[in-house]
């Protein structure tokens, strides 16, 4: 997933930006791999697509989501709504996220995750 300089210091899919949450690189990599395995890009989105969405995800202690992800940021694109829905669907399908360590719950209970097809699809 990727880092966004404008995010509120929460880890994103691929890297962390800021210092609020400090997931290990192995946790980030495992989260990225898990979500990528559940994600089906919408029609018209590929590795060269220059669009992304950021979703805020709240987790319960069992590493499942406590509610539906909320769209925080998106590039202006006609494909944006479809990308946001596909990202939400991937998160719903992938839970629980057992790679997130219970002892670090305070660090991952509230994350903003960036879905960037260029990074998810290796563009």
PLM feature segments, named:
Residues 21-29, 78-85:
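Soluble non-cytosolic domains of exported or imported proteins
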Residues 1-17, 36-40, 56-75, 85-123:
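Conserved "boundary/linchpin" sites in short secondary-structure elements
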Residues 29-33, 37:
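Internal, well-ordered alpha-helical scaffold/interface segments
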Residues 17, 22-27, 41-48:
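Long, low-complexity, Ser/Thr/Pro- and Asp/Glu-rich intrinsically disordered
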Residues 49-53:
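Short, small/polar residue-rich loop motifs at catalytic or cofactor-binding pockets
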């Amino acid at each position: 997933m990727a880092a966004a300089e404008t995010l509120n210091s929460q880890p994103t899919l691929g890297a962390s930006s800021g210092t609020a949450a400090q997931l290990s690189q192995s946790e980030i990599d495992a989260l990225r791999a898990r979500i990528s395995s559940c994600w089906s890009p919408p029609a018209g989105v590929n590795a060269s697509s220059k669009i992304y969405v950021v979703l805020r995800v709240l987790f319960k202690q069992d590493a499942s989501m406590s509610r539906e992800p909320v769209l925080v940021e998106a590039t202006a694109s006609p494909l944006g709504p479809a990308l946001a829905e596909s990202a939400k669907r991937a998160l719903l399908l992938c839970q629980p996220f057992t790679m997130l360590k219970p002892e670090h719950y305070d660090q991952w209970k509230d994350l903003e995750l960036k879905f960037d097809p260029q990074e998810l699809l290796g563009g």
